[in-house]
Design a protein with these regions (language model features):
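Beta-propeller-forming repeat regions
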Residues: 1-197
């Protein structure tokens, strides 16, 4: 229902059955999980449970496994440029109450170094336009490294793929450059990296 769509800490696994998308079962997620800015990855290890990486309400990247928090960034990440207004269905003083949600960019889980374990790439628009964070698991645990891409605008989406003949993945980013302070006019660039051997 529309009242429960953005409720924190809940998720349902959906399945395609008889030509329709239906609820299969409830999924255990972290209590702070929001359905915006989230990705599953194998960054906790190839043979362990998949980790859920998501941007929490305080703009920190959290990594959870089976609903348990295993890491939280100290640096702010995310910073979407869109805000969604939702009617809550509650009326107070004859006024319909609404809630506002910041739409966060979805992190990208992709193996950057060819070791078979995903790294998580997430924009840091909230810190600086064109800045991205790469989270990886090393011998001492999880680590976040910020990289300035040089993009002049807000990174709104990330994607990537790896071909059989390349050791490095191809990364695709959409960057929006707003033309005024009200963000009513903009131009979008789609930028793609090429693997270097």
């Amino acid at each position: 229902s529309k009242e429960k769509f953005f409720t924190q800490g809940q998720a349902e696994q959906m399945a395609w059955k008889n030509g329709k998308l239906v609820t299969d079962k409830a999924v255990r997620v972290h209590p702070a999980f929001r359905p915006m800015g989230a990705v599953f990855s194998n960054m906790n290890g190839k043979d362990s449970s998949r980790a859920l990486a998501f941007v929490d309400e305080f703009n920190r990247l959290q990594i959870a496994v089976d609903g348990e928090d295993i890491w939280r960034s100290g640096t702010a990440v995310g910073g979407g440029s869109m805000t969604l207004e939702q009617e809550t269905g509650q009326v107070t003083s004859r006024v319909m109450r609404t809630a506002f949600y910041k739409i966060e960019p979805t992190p990208l889980a992709i193996d950057l170094d060819g070791d078979g374990v995903d790294e998580v790439v997430v924009p840091q628009n909230i810190v600086k336009e064109g800045l991205i964070a790469i989270v990886f698991k090393g011998p001492a645990g999880f680590r976040l490294q910020s990289i300035d891409t040089g993009f002049e605008g807000t990174i709104t989406a990330l994607g990537g793929f790896k071909t059989d003949d390349a050791t490095q993945p191809t990364i695709i980013a959409t960057v929006v450059r707003y033309k005024n302070i009200l963000k009513t006019a903009a131009e979008t660039q789609v930028i793609m990296t090429v693997p270097q051997e």
